[in-house]
């Protein structure tokens, strides 16, 4: 390439590149689900059976303030959710024989709709922390203990649960962050320097917090999650210490919400240990049937979702090649902007090659791809692109964010009374 620009490309899929090309190594996954043990409309049995019928491979119940167990064991009963006795009926879990059949793929539901031979993997020891915060500063913990169980949580405090989960030996991700930022009122909140600095600080200090949700359910209050994700990548990657993985979960509270967002994990074998490794290393794709900024306000994905069938990085020539099915368009994104778009006439197979050198003026430190089709959207994790001088893209520190550290800076605004005043009562006095 002579004097042309050379990039060192960090490929999160390098360890599974060959596995991507085999259907057997793709695992349809949801790691954020609820039941009547917390605040959902459907029982655990109803949720499990629907996930099973919809050919999911891996499922975690991350209930509000309740640590998940194997599905044939009764989860803890938290007094906050006793209203379910009057509201949505009895709680219900499966028995040991049913659990075994679900895991080995021999379980029969009323619909009997499952097409896969393998079973549905249970992911225990998951929890959604800060179970009663009105502003929804929620954190999901995995492979953790009961340190966050039954804890209401402090408004605006992400750090306490992240720290507890890390101390337990677990990992975490931040849930629907721009819902907390009230993006439904101000979509540009994801670009406010103080907001970016707030989350960047958490990711710097807690490596066990492996990422954030970028796709969640119907993509209504959290539609700016991808904007925030790109802003964080621009800040953190040039520092040379970490990236942020983008997760997709349905956050289902009803069976009708189950197939709205999920992930395609690429695993060498079907095991919890491999799942954790994949969560830490970013060897998965995030998928959704709703993505308002990318697909349109009224778009609803129908049918087969886009899938990646091959992904190769050629560092010598500075290219990344992605092959997909069930899609019409592949877009490459850098710094939150689309820098290349490749299309075919109708949904089907597509191959897209990006030359980093050709787009060097628009690439700071990463690129990521998204595949669009009638079924929805698929997003890859970011590929770090280092031209040898990443440090020049490291920005000056933004205004110091207000971060709760052990409660020293806990103010009235961080109480439930303060939230009610600031978000519900105070605005009514404004003209």
Positions of PLM-derived features:
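C-terminal functional module detector
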Residues: 2-26, 38, 44-48, 236-245, ...
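Short loop/turn motifs at secondary-structure junctions
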Residues: 55, 207-208, 365, 379
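Short, Lys/Arg-enriched charge-dense amphipathic segments
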Residues: 66-69, 84-89, 147-151, 180, ...
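Short, solvent-exposed coil/turn segments at beta-strand boundaries
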Residues: 118, 141-146, 207-208, 283, ...
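Long, contiguous interaction/targeting segments characteristic
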Residues: 150-155, 159-168, 174-290
